[in-house]
Amino acid sequence: MNEEYDVIVLGTGLTECILSGIMSVNGKKVLHMDRNPYYGGESASITPLEDLYKRFKIPGSPPESMGRGRDWNVDLIPKFLMANGQLVKMLLYTEVTRYLDFKVTEGSFVYKGGKIYKVPSTEAEALASSLMGLFEKRRFRKFLVYVANFDEKDPRTFEGIDPKKTTMRDVYKKFDLGQDVIDFTGHALALYRTDDYLDQPCYETINRIKLYSESLARYGKSPYLYPLYGLGELPQGFARLSAIYGGTYMLNKPIEEIIVQNGKVIGVKSEGEIARCKQLICDPSYVKDRVEKVGQVIRVICILSHPIKNTNDANSCQIIIPQNQVNRKSDIYVCMISFAHNVAAQGKYIAIVSTTVETKEPEKEIRPALELLEPIEQKFVSISDLLVPKDLGTESQIFISRTYDATTHFETTCDDIKNIYKRMTGSEFDFEEMKRKKNDIYGED
C-alpha cells in the first residue's frame, strides 16, 4: 500500500472500472480501491435478495414465494446496452466480452393514450403498426430512408438541410410529420428525455436515430442487449482487464483521507497507510465537497410474478412513456428483465421504473408506469441526487465521475468516460487505445 502509483481509483462503478482498465492497458500503474465489500458502487447488482430488503430497510425477510435469495441479482440502476453503441465497442476492443454473455432484449414499447405499443423494428412491423395512419407511415418511411442515407461527409445526402444549422423541428416540418410521430421519433428512437432537442441543430438527432437503427439491424428484435447475471458483471469484467495489466484491487477499504498539497492531489490514506499518486479518479461519494447537485432521479424496483400486459409475454423489454403523454417535462422509463437473464427466481420478473424528479411528490410522478405493471409483489423506492463535479479537475488532478442519469442506456456514461479521459491525458479518447496488447497473457480460468 505504501507505494507510488500513476493513478489511484476510488469506487468500482462502471465509469471507474472502465477508466482503470484503459489506464492499465496504457501502461499506467493503477491502484483501485472501494469502501464497499462488493463491486459496482452505485451501479451494483445486489445479491442475495435478502440484501436488497436490508438495503431498502424493508422489515422481515423475502416471502417463500420469492424462491431462493441467491437466485436474484437486482440492478440498482436500470440500463440496457445499445447493440451498436459506445459501451459495446469498448467491450469488443478490450475483449472483455469473453467474460460476459448477453441476451437481446425482446422488444421496445412506447406509451400512447394510456396504452403501450411495440416500437416497430422491421418495415413489415412499421406498416402493420397502429401507432400511425397509412399516409403518416409513408411520410415516416421517407424520413427514415433520409436518415439512413445521411452522411455527414457527403453534402449530396443533405437534401437542402444544413446539419449544423437547421433545427430538428424544421426537419420534421420538411417531412410533414405529425405530433405523435415526432414524440415517438424523438423519445423512442433518438432517446431524448425532454423536448429541448427540437430547437438544436439536427445532426445529433439524426446520428442518434442512426445509432438506434444500426443497433436494431444487428439483432432484429430490439436495439438493446443485457448481460446474464446483471449489470454488475460489467464493472467486474473491466476490473479483471485492469488486473491482467497489473492493476491492484482492494475492496472493503475504508478511505480516510484524500491528501492534497498546494491544491494538487498527492495520495490517499486508508487504514493509517498512505498510497501516493499523480492522478485520482473517483465517484462523487468520495469527494462530497467537490461536487454539486443538479437534480434528482427516482427509481422504483418492482418484483412481478407475471410479464407486463400487452408486451406479448416478453421476458425482457423497455417501455418509454414520452413526457407529452403524461404532462411532464421528462420521459418515464421502464426496464424489464427476468429469470431468463439469471437475475431472478424462476417465473419472476424485475421491472425498474425511472425518471428525473420534477415535483415534491416523485412517487406520484411515476404512477402511469406503475399502473402498467400491476399487480406488483414488492416495491423498492430510491431517490438519488444527480451529482456533477464542480470543476474539470485539471488543477487538483482529481477527476470525478458524474452520477448515473435516468436514461436507459449507457451512451451518456460513455460520454463521461471519454470526457474524463481527455481531461486526464489531454488527448481525445480513441477506441484503438483500448486494444489489448498482442503479448497479452490471458488469465485462463
From Swiss-Prot:
Its main location: cytoplasm. GO terms for cellular component: azurophil granule lumen; cytoplasm; cytosol; extracellular exosome; extracellular region; focal adhesion; Golgi apparatus; membrane. Keywords: Acetylation, Cytoplasm, Golgi apparatus, GTPase activation, Membrane, Phosphoprotein. It is found in: Cytoplasm; Membrane; Golgi apparatus, trans-Golgi network. The modification N6-succinyllysine is found at residue 57. GO terms for biological process: negative regulation of cilium assembly; negative regulation of protein localization to cilium; protein transport; signal transduction; small GTPase-mediated signal transduction; vesicle-mediated transport. The keyword Nucleus does not apply. It is a peripheral membrane protein. Ubiquitous. It holds the Pfam family GDI. Belongs to the Rab GDI family. This is Rab GDP dissociation inhibitor beta. It comes from Homo sapiens. The lineage of its organism: Eukaryota, Metazoa, Chordata, Craniata, Vertebrata.
